[in-house]
Every structure is written in C-alpha cells, then in structure tokens.
C-alpha cells in the first residue's frame, strides 16, 4: 500500500502473508480428514464375526473374563463391516476430495498443491483414502518432495484459501446431508440403526454392549466433523 505523508513524501507499507498460519490450518484439516476416513475404512473392512453370536448369561458364566472380552470385542469391531450407509458416506467423502474448482478462470485440484493419496498398491491397509502433503516434514512418505503448497500460499494466498475453503465446505456439507435423518438412518449415525432395531428387536438385551459401541462411534465421528469445521473456520479467518 502506498500513501503520502503530510510533507507529500511517499511511504510504502507492505503486509506479509502469514504463510505458516495458513499452512497449519490446511494441514490441520487434512489431519482430521485422514483420521476420519481411515477409521471409517477400518470399520468397513473389519474382519467378519460370523459364528460369533451375542453371549447369554449362562454362556458367559462358563467362560473366563478374558474369553468373554475377546468374544464381545470380535462382535463389536465388526458392527459396521460392509455397512451400506457407511460405504455411501466413504464414497461421498472420496469423491468430494477429487473435486476441482475454478478460481479466476483457472481450474485447481488437490494435485495443484502437491497433495494426493498414495498409489493403490503402495498405500498401507485402510490408508488408500489418506492424503499426503508434498514437503511435509512430519510425513515420511512425502517429506522429500517439493513443498508446492507452501510455495502457492506465499505467491497467491487468496487462491489457496479460496480453493480449500470451497473444498472442505463441500465435504462438510455433503457429509451433513448424507447423515441427516432418513427413513432408515437416524441423524448422525453411520449404520442402519432403524433397520437393525426392526430386524433384531428380540435381541435387545443381548446387544446392549454393541449399542454402546455404536454410540462411541457416533460421538467419535461427530467430534471429527466438529474438528474439521473448526479448522475450516481458522482457515477462513486467515484472509
């Protein structure tokens, strides 16, 4: 910004972009997203608990505490295995992250900023949806690559903030729509709760522990959505 003093002398005032703050806000959003997508993939791809029925009191009394715990854990860990609702949410998230946005006449995608998932065969188990930022010193996979994101922030912060704001707003909005109350799923659940209750109502007492597990999942996912929203708000406040 150029201004003049009362003596008619020109003074130039420059404002530096807080590259680190914007970078951290974006990285925080990916940290929360990666945690969420990985946990969902783990739940969806969990091992089958076929043959493991909820234990009766008599069956529990004939087993050790350790045996009961392992048995029930096997059931709980598979509650969301191959769940249609969860799969739909996962696909929505992954499709949204592949979106591109036009800003000032130019199209941008995550790859424009050096952000991508690993190859199908090189990524770890349940990590095919996890994103890595080139040049991230804390990421052993991409730390040696050129830091395109930081360079983009330094040269054109408005475009960077605009892109990531649009991207994560889309993800957050679509997730909210997917998880809204419907005839088959209650709000903010990732399994067909109403359908399950109808099909297995006679086992209400036997699946109480399983229901507690589901509640834990719901709380976990909701907290991650909130964390993503908080990170998005911080990013929007940078400009």
Ranges and model annotations:
Residues 155-159, 208-239:
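Proline-poor, low-complexity alpha-helical tail modules
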């Amino acid at each position: 910004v150029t201004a003049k003093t009362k003596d008619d002398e020109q003074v130039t005032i420059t404002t530096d972009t807080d590259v680190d703050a914007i970078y951290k806000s974006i990285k925080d959003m990916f940290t929360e997203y990666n945690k969420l997508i990985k946990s969902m993939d783990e739940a969806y791809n969990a091992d089958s608990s076929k043959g493991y029925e909820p234990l009766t009191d008599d069956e529990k009394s004939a087993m050790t505490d350790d045996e009961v715990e392992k048995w029930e854990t096997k059931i709980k860990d598979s509650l969301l295995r191959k769940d249609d609702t969860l799969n739909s949410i996962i696909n929505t998230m992954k499709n949204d992250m592949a979106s591109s946005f036009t800003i000032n006449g130019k199209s941008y995608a995550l790859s424009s900023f050096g952000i991508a998932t690993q190859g199908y065969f090189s990524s770890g188990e349940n990590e095919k949806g996890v994103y890595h930022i080139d040049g991230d010193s804390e990421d052993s996979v991409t730390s040696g690559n050129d830091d395109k994101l930081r360079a983009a922030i330094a040269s054109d912060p408005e475009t960077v903030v605009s892109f990531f704001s649009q991207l994560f707003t889309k993800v957050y909005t679509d997730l909210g729509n997917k998880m809204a109350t419907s005839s088959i799923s209650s709000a903010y659940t990732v399994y067909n709760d109403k359908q399950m209750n109808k099909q297995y109502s006679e086992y209400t007492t036997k699946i109480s522990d399983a229901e507690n597990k589901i509640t834990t999942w719901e709380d976990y996912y909701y907290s991650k959505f909130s964390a993503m929203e908080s990170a998005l708000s911080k990013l929007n406040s940078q400009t």
